[in-house]
Amino acid sequence: MAEGGFDPCECVCSHEHAMRRLINLLRQSQSYCTDTECLQELPGPSGDNGISVTMILVAWMVIALILFLLRPPNLRGSNLPGKPTSPHNGQDPPAPPVD
């Protein structure tokens, strides 16, 4: 506890708030559970969504692969056999003239 009897945790999660959540949970469970049976399908969104996270990740991977294959030649890193690797054809550059 902090000075003056003020508890900052009480602002975030109070006992009353926790009890309200518990009561709401019990009330919701009563809507799909009876004395004789409990339904397996809980109310809410079903698991058969149109687009899943896996499908989104696969789509991003396909887009990345396409962009990788279609990158410009100067970003590919390999030179064509007829082109020199540097302006000096692999030799050291000439020394600067001495004044």
Swiss-Prot record:
Lumenal topological domain: 1-49
Sorted UniProt keywords: Endoplasmic reticulum, Membrane, Transmembrane, Transmembrane helix
Please state where this protein is localized. Answer: Endoplasmic reticulum membrane
Its placement in the membrane is given as: Single-pass membrane protein
Cystine crosslinks: none
Q: Which GO terms describe its cellular component?
A: endoplasmic reticulum; endoplasmic reticulum membrane
Q: Which stretches does the entry tag as region Disordered?
A: 77-99
Give the highest taxon in the source lineage. Eukaryota
Bilayer-crossing regions = 50-70
Query: Which Pfam families does UniProt cross-reference here?
Result: DUF2615 (PF11027)
Mainly resides where?
Answer: endoplasmic reticulum
Identify the InterPro entries for this entry. Answer: Uncharacterised_CD034/YQF4 (IPR020309)
Q: Provide Cytoplasmic-side residue ranges.
A: 71-99
Tell me the PANTHER family matching this sequence: SMALL INTEGRAL MEMBRANE PROTEIN 14
- What name has this protein been given in UniProt? Small integral membrane protein 14
User: What's the gene?
Assistant: SMIM14
